[in-house]
Amino acid sequence: MSITRSLSKPAIRDLLNKPSWSITSLLHNPAGIETPKIDEAVVKKMLRISGLQSTISKEETTKIKKALETQMVFINHLYEDDNVANNNSTNNDHFRLLPGDHRQQEPLNLQQIEESISSLKPSAEKGEIGNFTIGKLRNSPFFVVKARQ
């Protein structure tokens, strides 16, 4: 039993080849919606955190600011809910740069690394099953263990 009419291969190909929307239409900010503002300090901080050169020209800073604003407009569109009144400031929370997230940590030394390795325990939440032996692996239907020749 068919719910809809059957389509031939050429009809399906034509249907899929015909664009129904364009991403460029989503990159332009609709009228009446506030464009997220990004200042130069945010751009420099993002570049520094990303490990990129943060001493760039004004033109490059302007280009990056415009690109980030365009991305935020697009992401705002992705999070739009047609059934609920749109609150334009809600998505700005996703782009906060919190100082605590990017604090420089104290470098680990060999002793600290060895201690953390020795205290590791398998986590069932992560799907870790603990220690295993070659005998257990050979009997498991999901693994094939072959001896080296």
Swiss-Prot record:
HAMAP family found in the cross-reference section: GatF (MF_03151)
Chief location of this protein within or outside the cell: mitochondrion
Keyword check for Acyltransferase: no
Catalytic activity: L-glutamyl-tRNA(Gln) + L-glutamine + ATP + H2O = L-glutaminyl-tRNA(Gln) + L-glutamate + ADP + phosphate + H(+)
Summary of subunit composition and partner proteins: Subunit of the heterotrimeric GatFAB amidotransferase (AdT) complex, composed of A, B and F subunits.
A GO biological process held by the record: glutaminyl-tRNAGln biosynthesis via transamidation
Record keywords: ATP-binding, Ligase, Membrane, Mitochondrion, Mitochondrion inner membrane, Nucleotide-binding, Protein biosynthesis
Enzyme class: ligase
Enzyme nomenclature, EC number: 6.3.5.-
One Pfam family from the record: GatF
Organism name: Meyerozyma guilliermondii (strain ATCC 6260 / CBS 566 / DSM 6381 / JCM 1539 / NBRC 10279 / NRRL Y-324)
This protein's record includes keyword Nucleotide-binding: yes
Domain of life, per lineage: Eukaryota
Record's function text: Allows the formation of correctly charged Gln-tRNA(Gln) through the transamidation of misacylated Glu-tRNA(Gln) in the mitochondria. The reaction takes place in the presence of glutamine and ATP through an activated gamma-phospho-Glu-tRNA(Gln). Required for proper protein synthesis within the mitochondrion.
Protein name as it appears in the record: Glutamyl-tRNA(Gln) amidotransferase subunit F, mitochondrial
Membrane disposition: Peripheral membrane protein
GO molecular function, one term: glutaminyl-tRNA synthase (glutamine-hydrolyzing) activity
Miscellaneous comment text of the record: This protein may be expected to contain an N-terminal transit peptide but none has been predicted.
